[in-house]
């Protein structure tokens, strides 16, 4: 079986909803990053482009972004929707295709624009049309599980898990402070500088809070009426951004005399209780460790999507 190597990557600076990219459609944001990542003379060697997208207009924004970036029309592209895991699933598919010998070079990643996401509403033929507002039935958060369409489903799930593991708001806020501190340190050290694309003149990620204190976090109101833990300060924001990696086979790496940045060793995808969605991160880690015959102690860094 082939090896799957990451040979390069780029991402935009991350903007918050209605911030620095508020008038920039997702396909244009993605195209800017794709152009910065893949040199023109390499684009014809790309076997396919896989784009994760969670809040777009459906269709095939991956193909639209690739054409907007002036890739050769012969390069196929498609879109993956696994909501918050869309970009990662695009990468998983890319690695699987490389390892199975179906491709030698794939560009994979994701893009979302909360600022320009289309307004979605129930069709008047839908049985829940009147229940959710009729002509004013616009929603921004998709329905994730059977039953009521609850825009706060993810927040309620996170609150349930926090209560189940007896996590206090004060404990959670300490992790928030740590997260922002580490992000700030990485920014000041220029850790990601070689991989950042200054779309529309952007020079910094908008979500990193330079001035934030435990006292401030502890004073914020909770998001849920009966909630005890989650606030606007310890939950993720809505963002605009794009990120892509070039994934190549060992054959491609040798042929072009490249030095890989990393190897994608393996991956798993799991499902779990939609009412307690954050728990699935634990299930995925456990399954992957068992599959690869590793223990947690063998891994230097774990990174979990906070959404």
Predicted regions and their residues:
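Active-site-proximal alpha-helical scaffold in enzymes
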Residues: 82-112, 162-192, 245-251
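Beta-strand segments within the central parallel beta-sheet cores of soluble alpha/beta enzyme folds
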Residues: 43-52, 77-79, 106-111, 171-178, ...
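Flexible glycine-/small-residue-enriched beta->alpha junction loops
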Residues: 106-160
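Glycine- and Gly-Pro-enriched alpha-helical subdomains that act as flexible
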Residues: 250-298
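Conserved catalytic cysteine-centered active-site region
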Residues: 52-104, 148-153, 211-237
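N-terminal extracellular/periplasmic Venus flytrap/periplasmic-binding protein-like
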Residues: 11, 23, 27-32, 171-255
């Amino acid at each position: 079986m082939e090896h799957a190597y990451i040979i390069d990557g780029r991402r935009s600076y991350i903007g918050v909803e209605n911030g620095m990219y508020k008038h920039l459609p997702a396909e244009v944001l993605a195209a800017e990053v794709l152009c910065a990542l893949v040199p023109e003379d390499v684009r014809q060697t790309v076997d396919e482009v896989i784009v994760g997208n969670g809040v777009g207009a459906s269709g095939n924004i991956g193909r639209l972004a690739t054409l907007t970036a002036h890739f050769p029309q012969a390069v196929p592209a498609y879109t993956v929707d696994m909501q918050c895991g869309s970009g990662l699933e695009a990468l998983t598919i890319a690695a699987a295709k490389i390892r199975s010998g179906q491709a030698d070079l794939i560009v994979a990643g994701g893009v979302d624009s909360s600022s320009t996401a289309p307004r979605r509403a129930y069709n008047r033929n839908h049985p829940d049309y009147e229940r959710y507002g009729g002509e004013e039935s616009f929603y921004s958060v998709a329905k994730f599980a059977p039953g009521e369409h609850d825009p706060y489903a993810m927040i309620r799930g996170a609150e349930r898990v926090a209560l189940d593991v007896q996590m206090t708001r004060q404990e959670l806020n300490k992790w928030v402070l740590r997260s922002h501190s580490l992000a700030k340190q990485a920014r000041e050290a220029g850790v990601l500088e070689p991989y950042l694309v200054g779309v529309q003149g952007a020079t910094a990620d908008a979500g990193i809070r330079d001035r934030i204190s435990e006292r401030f976090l502890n004073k914020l109101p909770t998001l849920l009426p009966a909630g005890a833990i989650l606030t606007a300060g310890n939950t993720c924001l809505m963002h605009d951004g794009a990120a892509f990696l070039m994934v190549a086979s060992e054959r491609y790496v040798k042929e072009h005399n490249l030095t890989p940045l990393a190897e994608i060793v393996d991956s798993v995808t799991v499902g779990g209780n939609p009412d307690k969605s954050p728990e699935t991160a634990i299930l995925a880690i456990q399954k992957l460790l068992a599959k690869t015959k590793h223990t947690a102690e063998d891994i230097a860094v774990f990174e979990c999507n906070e959404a």
